[in-house]
């Protein structure tokens, strides 16, 4: 089941491992033309199935529905690992129900990434106030911020910049790469 193509359009996957992909982004200051060339080359080496899979960001229950459509997955199950690998999904979104403590969250993200043929976007909704999947959990030991309404009322761009940097740094340490 799933996406399938046949005939001359089908080719074997030649996507690089996570380690190889990380090396490609280590270089900073890449100009737009060089980035375009590298991205085009990478895309040329992807199968159609991998390209389609990259369009999807899913929750953990969509990777493993064996416990129902709303389960508090906190570990990477064998089925999740297989699904990430098989469909080359673009990313996962995690919710409060998936986030317990720092070590558990890092481990879950690492195992998902280790099974992904293309590095995943790992997302979490972390705005401040009531929208704080990480900071709202005292076991995560991250910085809490007020709601966006309160932040906006301050009209302090330096505060907003520092807030964004702090949230970004806090979630990056856990393995998230999209807020």
Positions of predicted regions on the chain:
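N-terminal, intrinsically disordered, polar/charged segments of Gram-positive cell-envelope systems
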Residues: 6-45
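Generic detector of short, locally flexible boundary/turn motifs and exposed helical patches
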Residues: 18-25, 58-60, 85-90
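Enzymes and membrane/adaptor proteins characterized by extended Gly/Ser/Thr/Asp/Glu-rich
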Residues: 61-76, 81-179
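C-terminal motif of bacterial Sec signal peptides marking the signal peptidase cleavage site
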Residues: 1-2
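Mature N-terminal segment immediately following signal peptide/propeptide cleavage
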Residues: 31-65, 85
């Amino acid at each position: 089941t799933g996406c399938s193509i046949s005939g001359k359009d089908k080719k074997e996957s030649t996507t690089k491992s996570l380690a190889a992909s990380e090396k490609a982004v280590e270089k900073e200051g890449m100009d737009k033309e060089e980035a375009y060339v590298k991205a085009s080359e990478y895309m040329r080496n992807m199968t159609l199935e991998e390209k389609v899979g990259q369009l999807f960001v899913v929750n953990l229950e969509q990777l493993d529905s064996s416990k129902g459509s709303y389960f508090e997955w906190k570990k990477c199950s064998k089925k999740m690992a297989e699904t990430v690998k098989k469909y080359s999904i673009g990313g996962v979104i995690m919710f409060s129900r998936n986030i317990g403590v720092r070590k558990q969250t890092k481990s879950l993200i690492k195992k998902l990434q280790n099974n992904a043929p293309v590095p995943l976007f790992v997302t979490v909704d972390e705005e401040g106030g009531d929208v704080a999947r990480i900071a709202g959990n005292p076991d995560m030991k991250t910085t809490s911020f007020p709601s966006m309404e309160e932040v906006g009322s301050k009209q302090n761009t330096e505060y907003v910049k520092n807030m964004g940097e702090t949230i970004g740094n806090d979630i990056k340490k856990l393995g998230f790469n999209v807020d």
